[in-house]
UniProtKB/Swiss-Prot annotation:
Function: One of the primary rRNA binding proteins, it binds directly near the 3'-end of the 23S rRNA, where it nucleates assembly of the 50S subunit.
Listed HAMAP family: Ribosomal_uL3_B
PANTHER family (alphabetical): 50S RIBOSOMAL PROTEIN L3, LARGE RIBOSOMAL SUBUNIT PROTEIN UL3C
PROSITE patterns listed in its UniProt record: RIBOSOMAL_L3
Any Pfam family: Ribosomal_L3
Cellular component per GO, a single term: cytosolic large ribosomal subunit
Name by which UniProt lists this protein: Large ribosomal subunit protein uL3
Subunit and partners: Part of the 50S ribosomal subunit. Forms a cluster with proteins L14 and L19.
Family affiliation: Belongs to the universal ribosomal protein uL3 family.
UniProt keyword Transcription regulation, yes or no: no
Keywords annotated in UniProt: Ribonucleoprotein, Ribosomal protein, RNA-binding, rRNA-binding
Amino acid sequence: MPKGILGRKVGMTQIFTEDGRAIPVTVIEAGPCVVVQKKTIANDGYNAIQLGFGEIKESKVNKPLKGHFNRANVKPMRYLREIRVENIDAYEVGQEIKVDIFTVGEKVDVTGISKGKGFAGGIKRHGFHRGPMAHGSKYHRRPGSLGAKGPARVFLGRKLPGRLGMERVTIQNLEVVKVDPERNLLVIKGSVPGIRGSLLIIKEAVKGK
């Protein structure tokens, strides 16, 4: 059964294995989350649960959202995200989902918003090659040709300099190294998208089964 949880990125560190190898890991504050809504094939065309995560002042929640939380009989949450599930009957509105749904060694997919880098050139943004850097060359880090003379215009979708980052990114098949249910911490091997404190969606791996 697909499973998932919302979390907040704490930061990166490293842990050592028994044979002395250092493993870079990311610490995530995962959950506890609350099921705010259930979506079924009969009513919505697909099975999913809506999870709430994070504290927020009630004064910062607008009236439509207050009504949404009141119908579920749960306190207001900062984040609401949907996660597709197969067995919708296994969940109930108001049910709490904790980090212990994952086990050590399990593979997960982590989704987040990548760090914003601001305006970047073609080399940094798309991996273009440089031109000659010696004296006499007038072409160093410029994009180069943008198309043929015939159309006399630049086609939509051409790779150009522009804003880099701040995009939804999913990293697949990351290994769960440690689970700490008491402190709601999930330790995952490798890096995950986003800055410290940003929202993450951790789901069971699609390709790592």
